[in-house]
């Protein structure tokens, strides 16, 4: 309804991106959650949550290399989240309407803009061009859950762990064998279906 009432390319592109994110999460999270539990059992000081962060950070590096041929050291994360006040205010307006419509929460647009600015700052802080930040926090958090280190994208992933399941090893209940890249491809199909029916279709059937 919001997009019908606000035919603006900023709103549309943001929502399209959100749908793509949702599609990948819903498709890949069963595998990621399973692997996170497995790694947490192997490292008693960690939690499934921190291992989830480590897996997604490793996959960020893997997908970046796959899609662009670049290493994380060549990318400033905050550039993935550029500051643009006009765009931020439109996104804040979108979220304000959604939060009120779905939950009855009257959140100010200023608070939502501040949340985006905070996120931009976090992206800047976890950009690690040399690998030294990750090593520092790994040392600080040694023997404890890696709440910070696990969210810093590594220059290259730990080659002792097949994060993307390239070997198609069984996972979950043992009947699943898809690699992350196969799930990635499935997610593109899910996103295409949602977006193809977004304004008119019954998304509850997806």
Q: Which residues fall in each region the model found?
A:
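N-terminal leader/auxiliary helical segments
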Residues: 1-17, 22-206
């Amino acid at each position: 309804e919001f997009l019908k009432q606000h035919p603006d390319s900023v709103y549309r592109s943001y929502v399209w991106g959100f749908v793509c994110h949702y599609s990948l999460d819903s498709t890949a999270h069963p595998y990621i959650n399973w692997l996170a539990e497995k790694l947490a059992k192997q490292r008693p000081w960690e939690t499934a949550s921190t291992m989830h962060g480590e897996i997604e950070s490793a996959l960020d590096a893997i997908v970046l290399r796959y899609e662009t041929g670049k290493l994380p050291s060549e990318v400033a994360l905050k550039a993935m989240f550029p500051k643009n006040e006009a765009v931020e205010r439109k996104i804040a307006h979108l979220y304000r309407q959604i939060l009120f419509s779905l939950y009855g929460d009257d959140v100010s647009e200023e608070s939502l803009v501040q949340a985006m600015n905070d996120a931009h700052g976090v992206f800047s802080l976890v950009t690690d061009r040399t690998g030294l930040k990750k090593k520092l926090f790994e040392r600080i958090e040694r023997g404890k859950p890696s709440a910070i280190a696990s969210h810093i994208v590594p220059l290259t992933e730990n080659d002792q762990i097949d994060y993307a399941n390239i070997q198609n090893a069984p996972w979950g209940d043992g009947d699943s064998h898809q690699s992350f890249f196969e799930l990635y491809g499935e997610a593109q199909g899910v996103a295409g279906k949602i977006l193809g029916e977004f304004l008119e279709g019954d998304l509850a059937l997806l």
